[in-house]
Amino acid sequence: MSVLTIGDKRLGAALLDAGLLTDEELQRALERHREVGGSLAEVLVDMGLLSERRIAQTIEDRFGIPLVELHRVEIPPKVKALLPAEKAKELKAIPFALDEEAGVVRVAFLNPLDTLSLEEVEDLTGLVVEPYQTTKSAFLYALAKHYPELGLPVPPPPSGEGQKDLKLGELLLQKGWISREALEEALVEQEKTGDLLGRILVRKGLPEEALYRALAEQKGLEFLESTEGIVPDPSAALLLLRSDALRYGAVPIGFQNGEVEVVLSDPRHKEAVAQLLNRPARFYLALPQAWEELFRRAYPQKNRLGEVLVQEGKLSREALKEALEVQKGLPRAKPLGEILVELGLARPEDVEEALQKQRRGGGRLEDTLVQSGKLRPEALAQAVATQLGYPYVDPEEDPPDPGAPLLLPEDLCRRYGVFPHRLEGNRLVLLMKDPRNILALDDVRLALKRKGLNYEVAPAVATEAAITKLIERFYGKAELSEIAKEFAKKQAEEEVPSPLELDESAAQKFVKQVIREAFLQDASDIHIEPRQNDVQVRLRIDGALRPYSTLPKGALNAVISVVKIMGGLNIAEKRLPQDGRVRYREGAIDVDLRLSTLPTVYGEKAVMRLLKKASDIPEIEDLGFAPGVFERFKEVISKPYGIFLITGPTGSGKSFTTFSILKRIATPDKNTQTIEDPVEYEIPGINQTQVNPQAGLTFARALRAFLRQDPDIIMVGEIRDSETAKIATEAALTGHLVIATLHTNDAAQAITRLDEMGVEPFNISAALIGVLSQRLVRRVCEHCKVEVKPDPETLRRLGLSEAEIQGARLYKGMGCERCGGTGYKGRYAIHELLVVDDEIRHAIVAGKSATEIKEIARRKGMKTLREDGLYKALQGITTLEEVLARTIE
């Protein structure tokens, strides 16, 4: 059975989001792929679902990888020699152009989304690879022609393109729209790059309208200057499925003299569209942007269900038309965007920005909002439930019936991302991300009938992450004790065991299991630690490490090897630390892991960090600020320039706060640059750069480069040295907003730390707008908390008396299954916000100490970390003991 590559998965998702494939079409293609193998693109073409050109266009639009007409490119021998013939055949890659000065080679890939092939070509050539895509026929022709040593028969070159381009060029010459010199120059470039002639000429200044007028004349079509006044006839639009209209760039707009009038955006698809219509047609040509506006008017909704039924032959176009006419008379469902704004879950400008992205790139509004980090998944689920009239379920608050999962098979739940929640009389409540998935509901009903169960299926909405965790918790559980027994048993069977060979299978099971459990328990890190006689595994949950499992010492090498292989690390190197990163996908779990290994006296230790996604980054309103502090915080981050510092130790939530700020202020009209080590959260719309010391890219060097990139906002992952501190301050003084993190114990110490790094006090006073120091304290578990009396010793150490907290209600968690017996579940931030005003500026210039600056700030209303922590303990959020443990006065 063939397995999908990462590139195939990316392609499938892009085609689905663009509306070029329905869910069922993709499912059928995946089933065929499992049978016949090859690439997903080849399967789609063979099944007639998409043309090769349309797939290429989608890859270019979505991933920025252009198409090269490889059969028309003359490849210099020294360029061809960069990749041996067998490797070119194996990797399905042919180098065709070389920029020696820049150290860049252009390579045509048959599977351009296969990152492993690209990386191998870079390793083999020692050059930076600029990827292009090519068609299968062009690749096979070029491979046989340029690598005769392979002994492949040379097929005929793909026909038609060269002749057409030549005619197009002559036509443009006749019209006087280009010069002979410009045409010859473009043809020379075409020979080098294999790009389309028209595209080259437009890049060189030919107006797009002139190109399309020439194409219309060449193909005998009427050119439409605008589609603004055209109102498509719905009955004409029904002649083409929405997916076909998008696939071929064709919109039927009406009827005249017994002919269907069709507007094209690509004249090459005229014959294919005529064949689909199977009736007389009159074709027009419009510019792509004008055509897209017309397409949106003709096909305002995807009508997925209707298209699936028509494609399956279960519904005629006439019946679909009749149903759509009836649908028009029904009350209009309120758009999701309106609901999100009305519920206060999203800002109007964020919804509008997402709608614009949706129009440009396809996909659903809700997915666009979540992927950009503008909307929390929980908020989306609540809005979808409101829009569709279904209940919203939070499994943490409303746990499932343990017997309900027995009603449905595991593979069905995983395939559709659904979960049987509970029985209510004769109704099965089914958790779904999208209750509109008719195919999922049909298959669930069928599965119930096969078991002789006649339950009504009642959809309810939950987040995808919540459903994933339920599936893993109820269907995917494996006992670690059994895996540990397997390690011990195998070790006992051999007098001289070879850990890697002996325990590889059990090690793989163990690593998968521990990642699964860490994911389900919201752990931030997994620690695999060798000790003298065994191996300890711990999970960091809510900031504290908890023992999780113990393995025999002989299991260490096997487990570490599995971790290294996952991250692409060198399994033979055991003397030096190594770092890596991997996207881990197993079952319903999809999580990014940052891996680190370190030699110790008892063997190698490994740490795996589970990275959050952009959609997990909270809004600034959810960062836990006390009311008065929040207003001052919003005012500071709204300033157009200056430097704002966020301080605290590792694990204090600085990154989350930083990106939450960027999420609010990095609007589309601003150029935002970040330099990080490493990049942990990939945020759409932000230019993110990763430190690379081996290549000489440091924080300071990146900052210098940023200043030449016309930035509005700069984020520095960490100010570590004097040079970085000085350049960051200089950037703030020259009209940029700089957000940076620093390691200090409190807010005032950040000022003296900059001074110690060599930044002049008068520059600090002029550039600094504020400092936020923060810590994370554990929250009292809501499921087992009880009211308690304060401990006298704790009060004494906090400098409080019982009279000072009289009337306050303090809580403590007693320990339960939900919190793992700790009494705490989740974490909450405490803050110390120092806002720089004139008095503090004068104190900085005068060289006042951190203690003196802190006292000035407190007189002006600043709450210290301990004071903010006490406020939140008295609110019942955390405990006095936790505040005492996390703060110093």
UniProtKB/Swiss-Prot annotation:
User: Keywords in UniProt for this one?
Assistant: ATP-binding, Cytoplasm, Metal-binding, Nucleotide-binding, Zinc
Q: Name one GO cellular component term.
A: plasma membrane
Q: Which InterPro entries match?
A: P-loop_NTPase, T2SS/T4SS_dom, T2SS_E_N_sf, T2SS_GspE_N
Cell location: Cytoplasm
Q: Which residues bind Zn(2+)?
A: 781, 784, 816, 819
Its function, per the record, reads: ATPase component of the type IV pilus (T4P) that plays a role in surface and host cell adhesion, colonization, biofilm maturation, virulence, and twitching, a form of surface-associated motility facilitated by cycles of extension, adhesion, and retraction of T4P fibers. Acts as a molecular motor to provide the energy that is required for biogenesis of the pilus and the extrusion of substrates generated in the cytoplasm. PilB ATPase activity is also essential for T4P extension while antagonist PilT ATPase activity is required for T4P retraction.
The Swiss-Prot or TrEMBL record describes its family as follows:
Belongs to the GSP E family.
What note about domains is in the entry?
Answer: The ATP-binding site is essential for assembly of pili.
Oligomer and partners: Homohexamer. Interacts with PilC.
Record-given protein name: Type IV pilus assembly ATPase PilB
Q: Which organism is it from?
A: Thermus thermophilus (strain ATCC 27634 / DSM 579 / HB8)
The gene from which this protein is expressed is pilB
